[in-house]
Amino acid sequence: MQQRLHAGQLPSSIVVAVLRTFCRSSLIFVLAACSAEPAVDPDAPNRSGQQRAYDDSDCNLQTVLDPEKPGAPGHLIPSPRNPNGDSELAVLMRRMVEQLKENRLRVKGGEAIEKMWPAHRTMRCAWPTNPKERNEGYDGRAQSYLATVRAFDEAPSRETYEAVVEGCIACHQVNCGGVIGFIETLRWE
């Protein structure tokens, strides 16, 4: 399948999801600014329980990572898959895959999903296998991916699920490309 790329080589599905999220938040801001009502706390949950905005000050590119933390260089997590051990990010991504698979089944079955953003957001402050790959490019791709995760959490559907998978692929086209074939198996059908 040929994917059309836009906005700095991101798949169009990610660009659309990010724009939808941005446009919604901009509209809320404009409406709040024009309203005679008291300002809405952007961190307060809305009617669906979702956060209107989020504070990423505890987990972002500037977050200093603990060098003694399990998964840090020299403190890799024992793994039956990898005799050398796994980084914190590798272990997190395996959990992310399991959560994504489970949520695909839940959406197909008409059940409520488990919100993914609270766990997936930590990808921005987890030790990668190669610490040099935690950089502005990676962080930008992570933020784009997380926008698709938030869109899925807000409106779980085949379309928003596929946007999450596209987000995975977009990042892995730059870092750790060997898993793209596996990620393709996460598609809806």
Label for each model-derived stretch:
Residues 38-166, 180-189:
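Extracytoplasmic c-type cytochrome modules immediately beyond a signal peptide or single-pass transmembrane anchor
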Residues 164-176:
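The canonical Cys-X-X-Cys-His
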Residues 27-28, 143:
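Short linear sequence elements within intrinsically disordered, low-complexity coil regions
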Residues 3-26:
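Bacterial N-terminal signal peptides that target proteins for export
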Residues 2-5, 46, 168:
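A composition/secondary-structure signal for short, hydrophobic, low-basic-content segments
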